[in-house]
Curated annotation (Swiss-Prot):
This is Proline--tRNA ligase. Belongs to the class-II aminoacyl-tRNA synthetase family. ProS type 1 subfamily. One of its GO terms (molecular function) is aminoacyl-tRNA deacylase activity. Gene3D superfamilies: Anticodon-binding domain, Bira Bifunctional Protein, Domain 2, YbaK/aminoacyl-tRNA synthetase-associated domain. It is found in: Cytoplasm. PANTHER family: MITOCHONDRIAL RIBOSOME PROTEIN L39/PROLYL-TRNA LIGASE FAMILY MEMBER, PROLINE--TRNA LIGASE. The gene is proS. Consists of three domains: the N-terminal catalytic domain, the editing domain and the C-terminal anticodon-binding domain. Homodimer. GO terms for biological process: prolyl-tRNA aminoacylation. Disulfide bonds: none annotated. Catalyzes the attachment of proline to tRNA(Pro) in a two-step reaction: proline is first activated by ATP to form Pro-AMP and then transferred to the acceptor end of tRNA(Pro). As ProRS can inadvertently accommodate and process non-cognate amino acids such as alanine and cysteine, to avoid such errors it has two additional distinct editing activities against alanine. One activity is designated as 'pretransfer' editing and involves the tRNA(Pro)-independent hydrolysis of activated Ala-AMP. Its EC number is 6.1.1.15. Keywords: Aminoacyl-tRNA synthetase, ATP-binding, Cytoplasm, Ligase, Nucleotide-binding, Protein biosynthesis.
Length: 572
């Protein structure tokens, strides 16, 4: 590719509305342009990267035995009603009607469509297992699209779906997909971890996320210091404290706290250790519980894990917090004065709260708190559950080492769905015994466009993007200085360009009439890994300058050796 025949579209200034570095650099490098909130046009440089990611994903899916299909983005609403997700999915599901008033959705995922397809095509256990994949546009009507293509409304995704008659068969395919995903991200030179995860709205019995480690990541990932345990913080179990509850040493007393409406204010004003305080959080109760609200208690220095809390049978799904008006209508006090003593509601306490003694909490009267609360003496111990997020230093759930926490960007997710969709949609095959059997399913997703942004978050410096070779828009840039004034510079540039192309190398020849500084800045910004600078002065000694974008090192290479040298440097 020649720059004179290419749309480079680089920007010197960082757009004001770009929050994270990947969004900033994708705009500045001329990879994307915003069309509307959460909607982006991919420009030539962006498309080249996107296609390389897509090709690696496709190759490894094929290697793992998956079969490519293509399903419509527009899906009939009745399939979503049949699966039960029409009501469950919420406003992220964009719904519309056609001219005949028939309801449809823009597909955020394709479990319903593939299940409908397979129940009409497969009728015998002898035809299974099968694994189908597609690389296709998805749409989710995000309430607040942000971070560029990291959380866009329209995005490119690889989704795969497998069908089985036994759990053992599903596990084999799940393991194969786990290995394929690992190979995909290894080929892209990404620093990633596969972690245990919650199944979320997709459902199922087991899942792993593939997280690219980056400070800008939205997810907290926990790791053991002494084992291979790794999980999303939403999933990680917080073990019960090993030490028994201490003996009570204080009397229960009620204290005036008119200016302490938060844990931080309570701790500061009364010199109370935060570990001796309890937060009482009110959420809406399940309608079958007989109550409007449920109280959830966590230690003052801990955070409620909403994913864990939502799984409690007495909690309404999805989990929603009560408003101050709702709380006052039942308790007669505001959110800053709540506690477990004399609380006329169901209470669930975290494991760490269950072993506390002599602790402080709201008195369910505005401006008052109880200090010196003790279980079994002042009130019975209520239901105990794991309700909190783990913190650094907690014992690892597998009992080996302690936990560390890092930030991650989710780029892939695999699920063992079981029979959630196949049972709801009556997707059966004839089993070995001649009886109809509900198929067992797995599903496996990779956010192809999100991978591009995640790679940038992990590979950049103050000058721009530093692409891994495998997904760079161009592997080599040829930068001839004043080629329009020097015949021999132009001749070598053209010869090198033709030879590299004949070797299957993605190369860009900068044949613009631009100053050297502009040429260097553009190639560094778009992240070309290998750069060759051809100048008259160096040609006097039959040399060219090679610069590696990642290492930043320059070295002189003989013109007769440059092709072999580049082929040895490029990771293919």
């Amino acid at each position: 590719m020649r720059t004179s025949q290419y749309l480079l579209s680089t920007l010197k200034e960082t757009p004001a509305d770009a929050e994270v570095i990947s969004h900033q650099l994708m705009l500045r490098a001329g990879m994307i342009r915003k069309l509307a909130s959460g909607l982006y046009t991919w420009l030539p440089t962006g498309v080249r990267v996107l296609k390389k990611v897509e090709n690696i994903v496709r190759e490894e899916m094929n290697n793992a035995g998956a079969i490519e299909v293509s399903m419509p983005v527009v899906q009939p609403a009745d399939l979503w009603q049949e699966s039960g997700r029409w009501e469950q999915y919420g406003p992220e599901l964009l719904r519309f009607v056609d001219r005949g008033e028939r309801p449809f959705v823009l597909g955020p995922t394709h479990e319903e469509v593939i299940t409908d397809l397979i129940r009409g095509e497969i009728n015998s256990y002898k035809q299974l297992p099968l694994n189908f994949f597609q690389i296709q546009t998805k749409f989710r009507d995000e309430v607040r699209p942000r971070f560029g293509v990291m959380r866009a409304r329209e995005f490119l995704m690889k989704d795969a779906y497998s069908f089985h008659t036994t759990q053992e068969s599903l596990q084999e395919t799940y393991d194969a997909m786990y290995a394929a995903y690992s190979k995909i991200f290894e080929r892209m030179d990404l620093n990633f971890r596969a972690v245990l995860a919650d199944t979320g709205s997709i459902g199922g019995s087991a899942s792993h996320e593939f997280q690219v480690l980056a400070d800008s990541g939205e997810d907290d990932i926990v790791f053991s210091t002494e084992s291979d345990y790794a999980a999303n913080i939403e999933f990680a179990e917080a073990l019960a404290p090993s030490a028994p509850r201490a003996v009570a040493t204080e009397d229960l007393r009620i204290i005036d706290t008119p200016n302490a409406k938060t844990i931080a204010e309570l701790v500061e004003q009364f010199n109370l250790p935060i570990e001796k305080t309890v937060k009482t959080l009110m959420v809406h109760a399940h309608e079958e519980s007989g109550h409007k609200l449920v109280a959830l208690l966590v230690r003052g220095d801990h955070e409620l894990n909403e994913i864990k809390a939502e799984k409690l049978p007495q909690v309404a799904k999805p989990l929603t917090f009560a408003t101050e008006e709702e709380i006052r209508a039942i308790i007669g006090a505001g959110p800053g004065s709540l506690g477990p003593v004399n609380l006329p509601l169901p209470v669930v306490v975290d494991r760490s709260v269950a072993v506390m003694s002599d602790f402080g909490a709201g008195a369910n009267i505005d401006g008052k708190h109880y200090f010196g609360i003790n279980w079994e003496r002042d009130l019975p111990l209520p239901q105990v559950a794991d309700l909190r997020n783990v913190v650094e230093g907690d014992i690892s759930p597998d009992g080996k080492g302690t936990l560390q926490i890092k930030r991650g960007i989710e780029v892939g997710h695999i699920f063992q769905l079981g029979t959630k969709y196949s049972e709801a949609m009556k997707a059966t095959v004839q089993g070995e015994d001649g009886r109809n059997q509900v198929m067992t399913m797995g599903c496996y997703g990779i956010g192809v466009s999100r991978v591009v942004a995640a790679a940038i978050e992990q590979n950049h410096d103050e000058r721009g993007i530093i692409w891994p070779d495998a997904i760079a828009p161009f592997q080599v840039a040829i930068l001839p200085m004043n080629m329009h004034k020097s015949f021999r510079v132009q001749a070598l540039a053209e010869e090198l360009y033709a030879t590299l192309r004949s070797h299957g190398i993605d190369v860009i020849l900068d044949d613009r009439k631009e100053r050297p500084g502009v040429m260097f800045a553009d190639m560094e910004l778009i992240g070309v890994p290998h750069n060759i600078v051809i100048g008259d002065r160096n040609l006097d000694s039959e040399e060219v300058e090679y610069k590696n974008r990642r290492a930043g090192e320059k070295q002189m290479i003989k013109t007769s050796e440059i092709i072999d040298f580049l082929l040895s440097q490029i990771k293919r």
